[in-house]
Curated annotation (Swiss-Prot):
The keyword Nucleotide-binding does not apply. This is Small, acid-soluble spore protein H 2. GO terms for biological process: asexual sporulation; sporulation resulting in formation of a cellular spore. Transmembrane segments: none annotated. Induction: Expressed only in the forespore compartment of sporulating cells. NCBIfam families: SASP_H. It is found in: Spore core. Its main location: other. It comes from Geobacillus kaustophilus (strain HTA426). InterPro entries: SASP_SspH. Belongs to the SspH family. GO terms for cellular component: endospore-forming forespore. Keywords: Sporulation. HAMAP family: SspH.
Length: 59
């Protein structure tokens, strides 16, 4: 996924189908410098993690 698209999704609070390693996630925040996104899995909202934006796939 492109950094700018991920950032727009996080800022708008859009719930758009985004996949990370085959599981659906929600983007909470994007760190421009590190090109990382703070996400949580839709089936495990308590499990947050930082992942590389380039590995996110919009469905």
């Amino acid at each position: 996924m492109e950094l700018l698209r991920a950032k727009r999704m996080a800022e708008a609070g859009e719930i758009v189908p985004v996949m990370y390693k085959g599981k659906q996630v929600v983007i909470q925040h994007v760190d421009d410098e590190r090109e990382m996104a703070r996400v949580y899995f839709t089936d495990e909202p308590e499990h947050e993690q930082d992942v590389p934006v380039r590995l996110l796939e919009e469905q």
